[in-house]
Each structure stands twice: as C-alpha cells, then as structure tokens.
Amino acid sequence: MALNTKTQLGNHQFTGPHTNADELPDRSGVYLITRLVDGLHEVIDVGESHNIAERIPSHDRMFQWNAVSGNAFHVWTLLTDEAQRMLIERAHRLAYNPVCGER
C-alpha cells in the first residue's frame, strides 16, 4: 500500500503501513508516523534516519506516538540517501505540522 504526500518539493510516495518493527527496512530514508482518524491516516510525526529499522524501535518519542494514536500508530517509509532525506523530512514537517516532535 502507498501513502501519497504533497510538499513544496513535490509529491512523494511512502510505503506501508508498517505495524511491526520486523517489517521496517534497514536502510536510509524518511519515515512518517500516522494514526487513523475516520479511516484516514493523519501524520503525527516525521523523521529521518540512516537505518529506519534501528531508529523506530528505540525512538525517544515512541511514548508520544502511543499516547496520540491510542497505541495504534503506523509507520510509512520512503527510502532515500542522506542529503535527500533531510530535505524531504523538513518539507513534510512544514507541510503537515505534526503534533509530535516539536522542532
């Protein structure tokens, strides 16, 4: 399944939703954390990592994700290199203003 997003950088297609840490790619990329609201995925956090599979299970905001989502958050991933992932993360923070991870 795909989650399509739109930012000032253009359109992006994230894969997911991943609900199990074993499904996460051990690669560089951007991740969106979402919750379901009336059947639609609402972005609650955005991040980037050199290894998404390592980052998500040990993330310091996981307690926020669980609190905001009722312990039912979803992870969506977009694989990309370091330079692109930082730009894409910033663009998504601006476009979606997620409730978790104030920067």
Model-derived regions, located:
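GIY-YIG nuclease catalytic motif and its immediate N-terminal context
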Residues: 1-50, 55-58, 79-98
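A broadly used, surface-exposed interaction patch
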Residues: 54-76
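Eukaryotic N-terminal accessory cofactor-binding modules
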Residues: 101-102
